[in-house]
Amino acid sequence: VPRRVALITGPTSGIGEGFARRYAADGYDLVLVSRDADRLKALAAELSDEGGRNVEVLPADLGQAADRDKVAERLTAGVEVLVNNAGFATSGEFWTADPAKLQSQLDVNVTSVMQLTRAALPAMIDAGAGTVINVASVAGLLSGRGSTYAASKAWVVSFTEGLAVGLRGTGVGMHVVCPGYVHTEFHDRAGIDMTSLPSFMWLEVDDVVRETLADAAGGKVVIIPGVQYKAITTASRMVPRTLSRAATSVFGRGRGRT
């Protein structure tokens, strides 16, 4: 029986690390993709030692076309699971942001998701089985603060929903998870001040991963972890977009996301 393989982008911290640890615990071999080669190797060594599984490291900056091509080539060889987790936000206002940084954000958040999914699907379809989990954000479902980041995540949601319809009957599952605020390094790295966010709005990585995999197993396409975020997104769909934007400006207390 072939070994099950999961390829995960951005696995060295936060949600990506949570997925890596969970799939390792479930007996999968791993392909870990990150631009942080040192942390990547340390995580791979730890997970290999724990279960004797094969953990392949693939250092890559998904903002660079050549590195995306390298990861795509690995995917054409076949994996059972692809988790497109890598992504980032930037701080400051859109009109003062470095255009190159904004383009890099789209390269990682959008282009890599498209390219890696395209590379992975043919082998999954041929096998009649496979799972793609795209990590978006609740920001992709809400009108309001945030421009490039929120738009990139809205693209991921729409992309996943469209493919989920097209892949019906193939045995391949397409899923997108839209977390809210999660205790990770994400906001610190982006320079976003989160000190005023109420404690009840925070989610834990393990809970996000657990809910995602449970909902994916049940066939759900758009996965929103946490009852608070289910309530917020449901309410947002029921009111005019102008009111939704106003509510989001209050809810989105983290300032400075572009």
PLM regions and their residue ranges:
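Active-site helix of classical SDR
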Residues: 117, 152
